Swiss-Prot record:
Regions of compositional bias (Basic residues) in chain numbering: 272-286
Designated gene of the protein: lsm14a
Family affiliation: Belongs to the LSM14 family.
Domain notes: The RGG repeats are required for interaction with ddx6/Xp54 and accumulation in ribonucleoprotein complexes.
Residue ranges, compositional bias (Low complexity): 148-163, 200-226
Record protein name field: Protein LSM14 homolog A
Quaternary structure, from the entry: Component of a ribonucleoprotein (RNP) complex, at least composed of lsm14a/rap55a, ybx2/frgy2, ddx6/Xp54 and eif4enif1/4E-T. Also forms a complex with prmt1 independently of ybx2/frgy2. Interacts with ddx6/Xp54 but does not appear to directly bind ybx2/frgy2. Different translationally-repressed mRNP complexes probably exist that contain either lsm14a/rap55a or lsm14b/rap55b depending on the developmental stage.
Source organism of this protein record: Xenopus tropicalis (Western clawed frog)
Length: 469
């Protein structure tokens, strides 16, 4: 496109939608990205045009500025391209360069076509904007400096235009990938400027060129990409910091942070350590590798039943039903078995049935009593203690729901914390004038004992009834 454009090298006056006028030399027009590149650009400000943000003119001369075509309001040609300085068509000439005297004035496209390389990252140490915006580009960018330290070739204008278009595309691609910082609020920005490299004068060396102003149009989508870049840089710093930990943590995290110690994917995996290894071990036990069980023939029930001896099973069952203690029987339910002849007759009449059921021991006789003798405790040698009765009641009826009172009552009934309180009634039955600390502790024990007594009052009532009976 640039080879067939007759305006390449012309002096262009451009007015942006922000009413700011720029003058520079048309370098290239990119139809794909809709951008226009000007060299040796100077900003004349708004020049009394109606705008909400008037901007004064500036004396700085920018090496080049790339404008977005959609933000250009007006574009006029001030001067046609100047004639090229003619060199003799001598095949012996391979390379040539112009002196610094011709750098101030624009001679031809070929005079500024051979660009010098952009200064390296270390030369842009004055501004953080340059460090991230132009430092990452490095030597891939080209500047419009006329003073070149090394001799360069003189390509035709079409070749120069196409090369600058590629550089502009590369610059926009790198900017879209987040190689720019957040917008600087201290600088006035124009919405049409995409990139600007500022210089004090045209004859100044390109290595000392600072960075000019940038456009807020590009700065709008940049914070998200720059934020991603900041996060990735923080992750890289974190990985670098983790690799410099002490040896103990390196041995524990070497597979995670140190890429030099990672095994190739084709090699056999090493045994895992820590909790991950335990999880892996549990996972291996749950896998059945032998497949489902296969049966060759049906189950033979007849041979399995022949292995059982029914007589031995019946004998073992009857032995379990017999009582272990063969002590002489005591009066059951307040009656003696040998008291009346009716009892003897009933026992003789039911002898065969009792022998069949439990080996001659009678556990229930409806003529004597309504209750059976299986769970009777009257034939014991001694009375059961309070703790045994409490345990039996708990097994029979369950534990009370009011656990707090039960726990306090147990402490009170056993004396609890009341040393002088006796059976939990230290305040009433303790020694009079026991004084201060002892009486207070006795009172505490007594209070808890009182609650506990109310909790198990029903159990004591049953026991008293049994004794009375």
């Amino acid at each position: 496109m640039s080879g067939g454009t007759p305006y390449i090298g012309s002096k262009i006056s451009l007015i942006s939608k922000a009413e700011i006028r720029y003058e520079g030399i048309l370098y290239t027009i990119d139809t794909e990205n809709s951008t226009v590149a000007l060299a040796k650009v100077r900003s004349f400000g708004t020049e009394d045009r109606p705008t909400d943000r008037p901007i004064p003119p500036r004396d700085e001369v920018f090496e080049y500025i790339i404008f977005r075509g959609s933000d250009i309001k007006d574009l006029t040609v001030c001067e046609p391209p100047k004639p090229q300085c003619s060199l003799p068509q001598d095949p012996a000439i391979v390379q040539s360069s112009l002196g610094s005297s011709s750098a101030s004035s624009f001679q031809s496209v070929s005079s500024y076509g051979p660009f010098g390389r952009m200064p390296t990252y270390s030369q842009f140490s004055t501004s953080p904007l340059v460090g991230q915006q132009f430092g990452a580009v490095g030597s891939s960018l080209t500047s419009f400096g006329a003073e070149t330290t090394s001799s360069t070739s003189l390509p035709p204008s079409s070749t120069v235009g196409s090369s600058f278009t590629q550089e502009a595309r590369t610059l926009k691609t790198q900017l879209s990938q987040g190689r720019s910082t957040s917008p600087l609020d201290s600088l006035r920005k124009s919405p049409t400027i995409e990139q600007a490299v500022q210089t004090a004068s045209a004859s100044h060396a390109p290595s000392a060129a600072p960075v000019g102003r940038r456009s807020p149009v590009l700065s709008r989508p940049l914070p998200s990409s720059s934020q991603k870049t900041g996060e990735s840089s923080e992750q890289r710093k974190g990985e670098l910091h983790k690799t410099q930990r002490p040896d103990t943590e390196q041995l524990r995290n070497d597979n995670r942070h140190d890429p030099n110690k990672r095994q190739p994917a084709s090699s056999a995996p090493q045994p895992r350590r820590g909790r991950g290894g335990n999880r892996g071990g549990r996972g291996r036990f749950g896998v059945r590798r032998d497949g489902p069980m296969k049966f060759e023939k049906d189950f033979d029930f007849e041979s399995a039943n022949a292995q059982f001896n029914k007589e031995e099973i019946d004998r073992e069952f009857h032995n379990k039903l017999k009582l272990k203690d063969d002590k002489p029987e005591k009066p059951v339910n307040g009656e003696d078995k040998t008291d009346s002849g009716v009892d003897t007759q009933n026992s003789e009449g039911n002898a065969e049935e009792d022998d069949v059921l439990a080996g001659g021991v009678c556990y229930y006789d409806k003529t004597k009593s309504f209750f059976d003798n299986i769970s009777c405790d009257d034939n014991r040698d001694r009375r059961q203690t309070w703790s045994e009765e409490r345990r039996i009641n708990a097994e029979t009826f369950g534990l009370p729901l009011r656990s707090n009172r039960g726990r306090g009552g147990f402490r009170g009934r056993g004396g609890g914390m009341g040393f002088r309180g006796g059976r939990g009634r230290g305040e009433r039955r303790g020694p009079p004038g026991g004084g201060g600390f002892g009486s207070s502790r006795g009172y505490r024990g007594g209070s808890r004992g009182g609650r506990g007594g109310r909790e198990f009052a029903e159990y004591e009532y049953r026991k008293d009834n049994k004794v009375a009976a």
